[in-house]
């Protein structure tokens, strides 16, 4: 899959991108919500992996803007510190998956498989 990873911690972003690459995914990294949104004006990945805690424009605000232009784009939220309100808002906005940050590497492949399965079901209808 072609992924957009929006994560402000450069080390975490590199580790995740390498792990995703090991699973055969092509990953583009953006370090701010604004840069992630700018990328999405030019490209459409198969899924977005989005940190909730981003500087300036947080992950929920980024998700809100993604939904305004592309309601069907699968978005996986990564969080370690999200508030219950942020989680509720992400769910309301139709986030595909929410993964706790320490568990991202362990549960990421399962999350992508569920997204791919949903896409196949939608294509069949």
What are these regions (language model features)?
Residues 32, 58-61:
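Acidic catalytic/metal-coordinating carboxylates
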Residues 55, 83:
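The feature encodes the CheY-like receiver
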Residues 85, 103-113:
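C-terminal output helix
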Residues 9-28:
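Two-component/phosphorelay signaling modules centered on CheY-like receiver
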Residues 43-49, 54:
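Active-site beta3 strand of CheY-like receiver
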Residues 38, 60-71:
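Short amphipathic alpha-helix used as the core "switch/output" element in two-component signaling
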Residues 96:
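Short, glycine/charged-rich "phosphate-handling" switch motifs in NTP-dependent
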């Amino acid at each position: 899959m072609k992924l957009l990873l929006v994560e402000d911690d450069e080390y975490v972003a590199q580790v995740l991108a390498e792990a995703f690459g090991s699973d055969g995914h092509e990953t583009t990294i953006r370090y701010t919500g604004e840069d992630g949104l700018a990328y999405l004006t030019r490209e459409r990945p198969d899924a977005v992996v989005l940190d909730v805690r981003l500087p300036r424009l947080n992950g929920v605000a980024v998700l809100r803007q993604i939904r305004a232009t592309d309601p069907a784009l699968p978005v996986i939220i990564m969080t370690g510190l999200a508030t219950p309100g942020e989680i509720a808002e992400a769910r309301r906005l139709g986030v595909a998956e929410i993964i706790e940050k320490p568990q991202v590497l362990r549960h990421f492949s399962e999350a992508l498989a569920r997204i791919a399965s949903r896409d196949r079901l939608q294509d069949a209808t």
